[in-house]
Amino acid sequence: MPRSPRRWTPEEDRVLLDKVKQLFSDGAKNDTTISWATVANALPDRNNKDCRKRWSKITGAKKGSWSLSEDEQLLEGVQKYGRQWAMVAKGVETRSADQCAKRWQHCLDPSLDRSEWRSDQDARLVAAVRRYGTNWKDIKKFEFPKRSTTNLKNRHITLFRQRNKAPGACPGSTETLGPGIDWWSMEQGMIDDMSMDASEDGDDAEDDQTPDSYTSISTSSFDDILGGSSSSPSAADTMTTASPDPYQYLLDWAVPSHADLVQAATSYYPSLDGFLGSTYDHNAKIDSSLGRDANGGNFIPGFPTQTPSQFESIDVSQISDGIVSGEPSRQGASRECRAASNVSSGPQMTLTIDNPDPQTMTGILEVLAKANSKVTISMNRE
């Protein structure tokens, strides 16, 4: 069982720095000559790899994208030393042993599977996350031995974002949008792995191996890896993983028309029939302003999802008992929904909401419904 991730404390950092300083004063020339096992003896809950990685992090090892020359030096080091990462890092000079290990294991190893993801593999990945959580090391070991842990992590994030963008998927819903994919479990498994210390993530590099213990590495693909953009590691294999934005789905959808809001809110709050009135001055059929999936489905975030057949065929007369006239018009930039017969001639208030989102509109409509208010709702979608 993998150890539970645990953040480094200020006291542990102090002990680490003091111990490394002592070893430098005793003759160690750089971090590749330090006995990390000796350092770990001063920190009962940390091993030599934890200490080495933490040291690299807090002492400002070079970060960011790898240059072509660094990759070339890394490849040369692997050919010469195998997976003795301390020796490889000494040749690279600008990166730590653990950075070299991760760069190799996640990007440059010619045995990695960099092929496009298929739908059945996506389903397997989601099932694996449900079983193992976000322990990418175990998922790689048992499910995708040829994929890098970074590739697995990034694909999971991509699927999560696609799920939030997809028409027909309400955030937090349990419905399945693809064959065999349980999107709810994806959301439950989506955590910010990068918040943990680098020494504690699920895809740590293994400890340095001696020349007798590492498997011979094929270098026939090295030139392919470095020889041009067409064969460079894909974006899914890069070392930077962006945390998922839980509000991404709000940024990529058009704001729904007021008719969509009224129809959805009425189905959600039956009491709205009482104040929306019996005659509507707008299109006879719902004109959805949202995107459609391949099957013609529509979706309004935060509201119950209608089936495509229901959503595209419901007359407004089905919402309230009145006569609706007029043909659909798809040219206007704004829509109006008026409870014409119920609008009072007394004092009125105009409330303007910039960039309204469905959740806000739901709350407003609920308050108005409970107050039995007479309202005029309009939306300018310029």
UniProtKB/Swiss-Prot annotation:
* InterPro entries cross-referenced by the UniProt entry: Homeodomain-like_sf, Myb_dom, MYB_TF, SANT/Myb
Task: Give the knockout phenotype.
Answer: Impairs the ability to produce 1233A and 1233B.
Any GO BP: positive regulation of transcription by RNA polymerase II
Sections of the chain in a coiled coil: none
* Name of the protein described by the UniProt record: Myb-like transcription factor
Induction statement: Expression is increased upon exposure to hygromycin B.
Which residues lie in Acidic residues bias regions?
A: 194-210
**Domain Myb-like, first and last residues per copy:** 1-57, 58-108, 109-160
| GO cellular component terms attached to this protein's record | nucleus
Q: Which organism is it from?
A: Fusarium sp
Classification via PROSITE patterns: HTH_MYB, MYB_LIKE
Main site of residence? nucleus
SMART domains in the record: SANT
Give the lineage. Eukaryota, Fungi, Dikarya, Ascomycota, Pezizomycotina
